[in-house]
């Protein structure tokens, strides 16, 4: 049975792939769950159009990611204000949310907190630090910030 996948299926393919599967697997699992549609000439043309649109969107996303990377690398004066003890140690640690808010406050681009890669030894004292921000697949930017007492 020839099917077009509408979602990623483990050990079979990703959305848009045309696959050949056994009749029972297609009828009893893939089609009822909406993971695939029958491969008709009209559906194949429709999938080709969707793939072209996805490729164009991926190119736009990549261009946008490069712009965000340039903005982040040019950004200066990012300060994370946190409560500290007299010795300069933080009550807790700096989290990804804090960094994202500080970047936004410094005039930088909006980032997703999941894009920030915090070091294994958490930021627990005042000073200057640097973390990575995974903006897009294959595009990583360094975010420099300073932790100051609030």
Curated annotation (Swiss-Prot):
SUPFAM superfamilies: L9 N-domain-like, Ribosomal protein L9 C-domain. GO terms for biological process: translation. It comes from the Bacteria. It holds the Pfam family Ribosomal_L9_C. GO terms for cellular component: ribonucleoprotein complex; ribosome. GO terms for molecular function: rRNA binding; structural constituent of ribosome. InterPro entries: Ribosomal_bL9 (IPR000244), Ribosomal_bL9/RNase_H1_N (IPR009027), Ribosomal_bL9_bac/chp (IPR020594), Ribosomal_bL9_C (IPR020069), Ribosomal_bL9_C_sf (IPR036791), Ribosomal_bL9_N (IPR020070), Ribosomal_bL9_N_sf (IPR036935). Gene3D superfamilies: Ribosomal protein L9, C-terminal domain (3.10.430.100), Ribosomal protein L9, N-terminal domain (3.40.5.10). Keywords: Ribonucleoprotein, Ribosomal protein, RNA-binding, rRNA-binding. PANTHER family: 50S RIBOSOMAL PROTEIN L9. Binds to the 23S rRNA. Belongs to the bacterial ribosomal protein bL9 family. This is Large ribosomal subunit protein bL9. The lineage of its organism: Bacteria, Bacillati, Actinomycetota, Actinomycetes, Mycobacteriales. The gene is rplI.
């Amino acid at each position: 049975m020839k099917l077009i996948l509408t979602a990623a299926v483990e050990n079979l393919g990703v959305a848009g792939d045309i696959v050949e599967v056994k009749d029972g697997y297609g009828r009893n699992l893939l089609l009822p769950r909406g993971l695939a549609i029958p491969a008709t000439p009209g559906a194949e043309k429709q999938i080709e159009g969707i793939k072209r649109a996805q490729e164009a969107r991926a190119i736009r996303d990549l261009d946008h990611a490069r712009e965000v990377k340039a903005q982040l690398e040019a950004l200066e004066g990012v300060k994370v204000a946190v409560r500290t003890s007299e010795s300069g140690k933080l009550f807790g640690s700096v989290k990804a949310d804090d960094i994202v808010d500080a970047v936004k406050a410094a005039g930088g681009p909006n980032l997703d907190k999941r894009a920030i890669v915090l070091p294994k030894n958490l930021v627990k004292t005042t000073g200057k630090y640097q973390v990575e921000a995974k903006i897009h697949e294959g595009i990583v930017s360094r975010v420099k910030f300073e932790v100051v007492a609030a």
